[in-house]
């Protein structure tokens, strides 16, 4: 997984 969006959420 990688950080997505302004919060670090899984893509």
UniProtKB/Swiss-Prot annotation:
Modified residues (4-hydroxyproline): 10
Record's subcellular location: Secreted
Tissue expression per record: Expressed by the venom duct.
MF GO annotations: ion channel regulator activity; toxin activity
Main location: secreted
GO cellular component: extracellular region
Chain positions found as Cysteine amide: 11
PTM comment text: Contains 2 disulfide bonds.
Record's keyword annotation contains Magnesium: no
Domain of life: Eukaryota
Keyword tags: Amidation, Disulfide bond, Hydroxylation, Ion channel impairing toxin, Secreted, Toxin
Keyword Transmembrane helix on entry: no
Primary role: Probable toxin that inhibits ion channels.
Domain remarks in the Swiss-Prot or TrEMBL record: The cysteine framework is I (CC-C-C). Alpha3/2 pattern.
Name of the protein in question: Conotoxin Ama1245
Organism: Conus amadis
